[in-house]
Amino acid sequence: MKKIILVAGGTGGHFFPAVALGEELIKRGYEVHFITDLRCKQYIKQDMKVIFHILDLKRSGNIFLFLPRLSIAVLKAIKLLYNMKPSVTVGFGGYPVIAPMFAAIFLRVPIIIHEQNSYLGKVNKFFASFAKKIAISYEKIKNLPEFAKSKIVVTGGVVRENIRELKVIEMSSRGLTTGSKKSLIKALDSVVKPRNDKLFTIFIFGGSQGAKLFSELIPASIQILMQKQPSLELNIIQQAALDDQVKIKDIYSKLNITYEFAEFFDNMALQYKEADLVISRAGASTIEELTYIGLPAIFIPLPSAADNHQYYNAQLLEDEKTGWCLEQNNISAGKLADKILDLISNPKILEDASQNLLKRRKEGHKLLSNLIEEVI
């Protein structure tokens, strides 16, 4: 049985798509090993079928500290790969992949890199010259070296299986000013559970890097929104830290808004299928999931994201009329409230965005697996 190594770490945005790819490759008869770092250890579940290896590389701004750490990590990775004898190594970008990718190059193991964002990251750009193929999610990608263009294959991003099981069902008029809306129902469900036809549900989450800003901005925006449209029936599903939830619950209760909170949503499919609109960061995996199911979103890019890639992701979607980008440095509770009210009051805008999202959907788990099989 041929062995394939996947390398991803740092955040859930890198981790979960790589796991989804691993599951597809296992179905095709490969033995899949996954090298990740300590930060992603929390995401490992017993029912995941890939074989995990923890290889941590701590970041440091001091080159004299980082180089010895990198050297040790590379030696460990060389030993690991030498014993495995993989047919290919696939890296998803970010500094946690550096040591395993160097090890693969040293051992002459073919490498493939996958860039999830619309901006080629520093690590992927460095390894581009060594890669057999470069898989990308967006047809338009910034920061791509001229020499790498011949290696490019557009595969789209990889979406988790439980999200892929969702399908879009056209619903008739829901009775609110929102008119016809889309309800996301699990493919295996035969009966649509009844819900309040007038209820507009907003799903708010900040990803694995946290949502502290949202715990302050969103409640303030909802207060303004309800002042402008008191008859609006809202349901809020929101990621929030425990110490923020009491304060937010008090605000929503006074506004007569139904709500659901969690520090982290383990099964996003359950929340996606209830939502009419998402407010989130603009990480690549989030965008791929929303694209796959045609769920429109207001994106507030994380300013500290490497190379400002979240801004480029969100701006590209806005240019394609598939989402809306509000920069954190320029946003206010009033601006966000106005945008939400505009979308609720003009359902055609939401519906068009949903259709545009579905047009750019790709079966990334299959396309990337096909590419890997070509290289092996």
UniProtKB/Swiss-Prot annotation:
Main location (coarse class): membrane
Subcellular localization, as worded in the UniProt entry: Cell inner membrane
Entry keywords, A to Z: Cell cycle, Cell division, Cell inner membrane, Cell membrane, Cell shape, Cell wall biogenesis/degradation, Glycosyltransferase, Membrane, Peptidoglycan synthesis, Transferase
Binding site for UDP-N-acetyl-alpha-D-glucosamine: T11, G12, G13, N117, R160, S208, Q310
EC number assigned by the record: 2.4.1.227
Reactions performed catalytically: di-trans,octa-cis-undecaprenyl diphospho-N-acetyl-alpha-D-muramoyl-L-alanyl-D-glutamyl-meso-2,6-diaminopimeloyl-D-alanyl-D-alanine + UDP-N-acetyl-alpha-D-glucosamine = di-trans,octa-cis-undecaprenyl diphospho-[N-acetyl-alpha-D-glucosaminyl-(1->4)]-N-acetyl-alpha-D-muramoyl-L-alanyl-D-glutamyl-meso-2,6-diaminopimeloyl-D-alanyl-D-alanine + UDP + H(+)
Superkingdom of the organism of origin: Bacteria
SUPFAM superfamilies noted in UniProt: UDP-Glycosyltransferase/glycogen phosphorylase (SSF53756)
A single BP term in Gene Ontology: cell wall organization
Biochemical pathway: Cell wall biogenesis; peptidoglycan biosynthesis
Membrane topology: Peripheral membrane protein
Record-level GO cellular component terms: plasma membrane
GO MF annotation list: UDP-N-acetyl-D-glucosamine:N-acetylmuramoyl-L-alanyl-D-glutamyl-meso-2,6-diaminopimelyl-D-alanyl-D-alanine-diphosphoundecaprenol 4-beta-N-acetylglucosaminlytransferase activity; undecaprenyldiphospho-muramoylpentapeptide beta-N-acetylglucosaminyltransferase activity
Record family assignment: Belongs to the glycosyltransferase 28 family. MurG subfamily.
Function (record text): Cell wall formation. Catalyzes the transfer of a GlcNAc subunit on undecaprenyl-pyrophosphoryl-MurNAc-pentapeptide (lipid intermediate I) to form undecaprenyl-pyrophosphoryl-MurNAc-(pentapeptide)GlcNAc (lipid intermediate II).
Name of the protein in question: UDP-N-acetylglucosamine--N-acetylmuramyl-(pentapeptide) pyrophosphoryl-undecaprenol N-acetylglucosamine transferase
Organism per entry: Rickettsia peacockii (strain Rustic)
